[in-house]
Amino acid sequence: KLKGTGVRVTRVGDQIILNMPGNITFATNSADISASFYPVLNSVALVVNEFEKTYVDVIGHTDSTGSAEYNQQLSVRRAQSVSSYLQSQQVLPERLLTSGMGPNSPVASNDTPEGRALNRRVEIILTPLT
């Protein structure tokens, strides 16, 4: 369901991780979801609802440009935006845990524009109920 959307899907142990790059999710310095990203989030919601016996962590990440405090707040607001939208698509709120990591969990170097782009992302982690 997510093929061709720009969302990278990875399985780590029992978890399924959906990595959504920031460039397709939000405008710079904004927590407003890009209109072009709603169809992708609709597909994400279908996947999340398909795996109904899971907890859903929605985690916002930023690059290191700007202050750590600002980036922390931005990452939380972005995760909250995605979480709110998933709730509007019938994902139950009690399944959702929303957090922001700011610039603290980079997946690439913040020394290059390409690396910073990779670090600006929202991850959704599906963890089975135990």
Q: What are these regions, as identified by a protein language model?
A:
Residues G13, I24-T25, P113-R116:
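Short alpha-helical interface patches
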Residues I16-P21:
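Short, aliphatic-rich beta-strand segments
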Residues G13-Q15, R121:
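Conserved catalytic motifs of the protein kinase core domain
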Residues L2-R11, T25-I59, S83-S88, I124-T130:
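Periplasmic peptidoglycan-binding/anchoring modules of Gram-negative envelope and division proteins
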Residues A31-A35, I59-T130:
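Periplasmic OmpA-like peptidoglycan-binding domain that tethers envelope proteins to the cell wall
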